[in-house]
Structure formats: C-alpha cells, structure tokens
Design a protein with these regions (language model features):
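Membrane-interface extramembranous regions
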Residues: 55-268
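N-terminal chloroplast transit peptides
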Residues: 1-45, 53-54
Length: 268
C-alpha cells in the first residue's frame, strides 16, 4: 500500500499537460496575453497623412497638370502659336459668317423668320452675367492668369475680371432685351437713347471678344467649369466654333450703332 502513492502521483504528473490543454482557464481581467504573429503575417506600414486639400486636375493648381488636350504641357512658344491660331480661326469664321454667308441668305424667308428673334440672346448673356456673381469661383477658374501662353496679360486680377465682365454682361443683355421688348410692345423710346438693341449688341460683341481667352484657356489647360465637371476637348472645340456664330450675330445686330459712329466721326 505505501508503494501506491508514488505511482499515482507519477500518473497524475504525466496527465497534467493533457488536462491543461483540455481545460483552458480564462485570462484574468488585468492580464493580457501577447498576440501571436504567424510567419505569413505582413508587418503594418504607417500610411502617410493625406492632405486636407488634394490637387484636382483642372481646378486651381491642378490646371498646371497635363490637360486632356495636352496643350498646356507643350513649350510656351508652341502654346502661343496654337492659341494665336485659334484666335485667328475665330476671327476668320466671324468675318466669313457676317460677310458672304449672311449676304447670301439675307432677305430669304429663313432670314426674315429668324433675324427678329436674335435679341433673345440677351437672356443668355443676362443669365451668364448673374452667374459671374453666383458662381464666381467657377468663372475665376477658367480665367487665365497673367503669363498664360507666354503673352497673356491684363491689369486686373482674375476675380476682378470675373466681376466686371459679369456686370457688363448683365447690362448688355438687359439693355438689348429692353430695346427688343419695347419694339415688341410698340413703345417708342426717346431718340436720346439711340438704337438700344444695337447698342446692347455692340456691347456684347466687344465683351465676347474680350472673354474669348477664357474659353480658349478652358481648352488648353483643361480648366473646369463647373469645378466638378471635366469637359472633353471636343466639347471645347465645338464651343469655340460657336464663338464665331455669336460674334457674327452680334456684329449684325450692332450695324446701326456702327453706322452712327462712322457718321459722327465723318467717315461717311
């Protein structure tokens, strides 16, 4: 009997590892076990902090990134040549439309039907002028800063250019609509006001020529307007082609004012 205790104790000691594996006690609240990392686990790498404001192509500093047209990454001399060619094409298109093309259709049924409706363009300019103030950030984004293309320069800041051109658009569009509405209502305006529709049209013609660089800048530098919309180069090209149409229509409506000016200057 005395020899039985050591044998039982020996068996008990041998069974302790199995008992420990079968019955795991929960860890104490104050104690934590070290995590086991498998050999296949990848070590975590600290991520660089994200900038609060990331650069977006076509917006602000993002206009310096390569645009969809790729023009803004060309050498400055190449950019200048492309832009001057665009200006020349718009001018030539305006002259051709207002000259031989309008002359060919002037007096036709289509001309007589459509020509009286042209002052409706005043609504477009009036709305655009108001947008210069309500969407000033977007218009400023497509306004070329000084030094663009190596030659562009204005004495004012982009924001000021947005504001004063918006004011002129509101005046020109509203003045042209005022004259057209008076004619439609059969109201004779004082002669001192001059040819109201024509004066408004000439104002908008000059303004459209002045702001044309903004439309070209949107193409060359991919400048977004609205800020969250990236316009493809083909759409910009169509918009620039339509610039000639606008200029030709406004120049046609401005003829009475131009004739008055030539007469007053003794050129007629």
């Amino acid at each position: 009997m005395p020899m039985m205790l050591p044998n039982k104790l020996f068996v008990l000691l041998l069974s302790l590892p199995a008992l420990t594996a079968a019955f795991k006690l929960p860890a104490s609240p104050g104690l934590t076990s070290a995590p086991q990392i498998s050999s296949s686990a990848q070590p975590r790498i600290a991520q660089p902090p994200k900038c609060a404001e990331s650069i977006v192509r076509g917006v602000g500093e993002g206009r310096k990134l390569q645009s969809p047209s790729g023009i803004n990454t060309q050498p400055v001399i190449v950019q200048a040549g492309i832009v001057l060619a665009i200006f020349a094409a718009i001018g030539a298109g305006t002259a051709i439309l207002h000259g031989p093309i309008f002359d060919a259709v002037r007096g036709s049924d289509l001309w007589n039907l459509s020509r009286p409706t042209w002052p409706i363009l005043g609504f477009i300019y009036l709305a655009a002028g108001i947008a210069h103030f309500t969407e000033a950030d977007g218009f400023e984004n497509i306004t070329p800063p000084n030094g663009t293309w190596g030659f562009y320069y204005t004495p004012f800041s982009p924001r000021f250019n947005v504001l004063w051109t918006g004011a002129v658009e509101i005046f020109g569009g509203g003045w042209m609509l005022f004259g057209a509405a008076s004619q439609l209502a059969g109201i004779a305006l004082p002669a001192a006001l001059g040819p109201v529709v024509s004066d408004g049209a000439l104002t908008l013609f000059l303004l459209t020529a002045i702001v044309t660089p903004a439309n070209v800048y949107a193409l060359t530098h991919g400048a977004n307007f609205p800020l969250d919309l990236e316009t493809p180069p083909k759409a910009h090209a169509i918009r620039l082609a339509f610039q000639s149409v606008l200029l030709a229509m406004l120049l046609e409506m401005a003829q009475p004012t131009l004739l008055d000016a030539q007469y007053n200057l003794g050129l007629l």
